[in-house]
Amino acid sequence: MSLAEQIEQQQDDAGWSAHLQLRFVQRDGVTRLGAWKHFGPLLVQRPFYPEGAPCHVYVLHPPGGIVAGDRLELDIHLEPGSHALLTMPGASKFYRSIGPTARLAQRFHLAAGSTLEWLPQDSIFFSGARASLASRFTLEPGARLLAWETLCLGRPVMHERFDHGALDSLLHIELPDEVGLHERLRLEGGHLGKLGGHPLLATFCAAPANQAVLEQVRPLLDELGNPAGATLLGSLLVIRVLDHDNQHLQRTLQRLWHVLRPAILGLPACPPRIWAT
């Protein structure tokens, strides 16, 4: 093997891999964690049932940070009629990298009549991080979705800018008989013009939605005082918010969730206990 081939092999072997696969099923009117497999440090705590039938699960990433060459995969499958709410106790941190790109791939399959609430903490990209983030949601007929994603470039609370590094973020939401959402955001360190100079971007997606639901969220966005907007893509409601303050942005997302959960799911808000800590 040549020196160049050895270096390439070392780069490919850099970092570690982790994979978490969860399958939710409905049994006797209650959603259960029917099966789960994991490799590496991606784990889940035991399910919680603070509101009866829906299953609340916390996804854990014990090391707390993602570095050069790390590869994480999250694969979530909801069987017909099941309802799962997933969140995380902490942010996903992508640290400075001088090696291969760190990669996080998340796949969610919602079978007919199932419901997913994906409400993670933010993904923080330290200055110098090189990261790839890919999230794909596939909805079958009758499935319902409430999902948000928050990208934090740099550490605003520490006055640290994302001066160098790179982020490649993909978001796909596939709906039956509709176009859905297929987008890609590429950012280079020091060039946040696409975000109007804001270090924080949140995207909140809800389905199925209609014009009445859109009108419910617009007053909340109008009073924020920072750039925000909402639009309907068929039956998919897409909300985007820019901010300079992570805590303020998290409160905004939770307020939107308190509005959208009754509107989309017909259920009162039942915040995960971890939000109160």
From Swiss-Prot:
Tell me the domain of life: Bacteria
Any matching Pfam family: UreD
The protein's GO terms of the molecular function aspect are: nickel cation binding
Enumerate the subcellular locations listed in this protein's record, separating them with semicolons. Cytoplasm
UniProtKB keywords: Chaperone, Cytoplasm, Nickel insertion
Q: Which GO terms describe its cellular component?
A: cytoplasm
Q: State whether it acts alone or in a complex, and with which partners, per the record.
A: UreD, UreF and UreG form a complex that acts as a GTP-hydrolysis-dependent molecular chaperone, activating the urease apoprotein by helping to assemble the nickel containing metallocenter of UreC. The UreE protein probably delivers the nickel.
Q: What does this protein do?
A: Required for maturation of urease via the functional incorporation of the urease nickel metallocenter.
Similarity comment: family membership: Belongs to the UreD family.
Q: What is this protein called?
A: Urease accessory protein UreD
